[in-house]
Amino acid sequence: MNLLSRFSHRALFSTLCLSAASWIGINTAHAQISTLRTGKLPNGLTYYISKDAGGSQGTAHFYLLQNVGALLENDQQQGLAHFLEHMAFNSTKHYPQGVMTWLRQRGLYDFDARTGQDETRFSISEVPTAAPGLTDSVMMVLRDWCDGVNITDKDTEKERGIVIEEWRQRNSVSKRLSDSIASVVYNNSQYAARNVIGPLRSLETLTAKDVQRFYRTWYRPDLQCVVIVGDIDPEVYEAKVKAMFGSIKKPKKAEVRANFTIADNTTPLYYRFVDAENQSHSYGLYQRVATPTSLQGQAATKEFLFQQLFNDIAPKYFAYLRNDNR
């Protein structure tokens, strides 16, 4: 755990003010919930579409959320979920030259993707809405990500070098620490066995067919969600989503998407980490908190914000006490 060396009451006050401002913003968003369009297509794909009355004048933001992450990998597939995320920016059905190339050629640089243990998220933001053809094309990128990624041997070899270099850059003391303590933090669950990027041996040996198999198994409409927010007419974009994404086929025999949990330990767990490159002494205290499943809407939002606020303030305050209130 990294602790700040200094902490002041003013810093605490500023943090509280910022968090309160975020809270007010969320409540304001709930007051405008009438603009939200949500639904589920017959193939199982979920969508959320809303007009942003605030800071998105003239632009829109597009997201594709996959209920697919590293936890769904078997022992021979470790690292595939993250590798597939990289592959999605290469050749696709409607963008054979590569999605990343197409986006940059049109001045769209605010795009990103992230793979976690539970999910994978893609985003293309700050898309001008004055040209409907551009937003339609961006929606087609999301559509291709759903089931139209071209996973070729050539692209696989190119991304292999990129991902292996990413693995090497991450192979730091902090990464080795997080991997080492995972067994106690996650109580030897599947979360402890999947660190997203995967082991080097897997990255060196995976094939295009391996990636294709994972893609065809898990990237499917019942595990996908499209989110569009911005200076848009939600009714118009809802019709576009239905027309564009409704044709995605749901597999007749789909693999069951398992839900993974972390069992409570009966006594506190402890791990001592020693590394030759570690230049500092530190300690960490972890408390697992169950995600509330019964909360919905505003109550769920407030609970989420409270946890984020606590996680932000607590380490700073402990650092403040450690440094004799300086």
Protein language model annotation of sequence segments:
Residues 1-9:
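N-terminal secretory signal peptides that target proteins for export/translocation
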Residues 14-25:
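Bacterial N-terminal signal peptides
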Residues 29-31:
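Boundary at the C-terminal end of the N-terminal hydrophobic targeting segment
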Residues 90-92, 111, 138-141, 145, ...:
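Scaffold signal of the M16-like zinc-metallopeptidase fold and its non-catalytic homologs
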Residues 91, 124-159:
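M16/insulysin-pitrilysin zinc metalloprotease superfamily fold
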Residues 225-283:
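An aromatic/glycine/proline-enriched structural segment found at the starts
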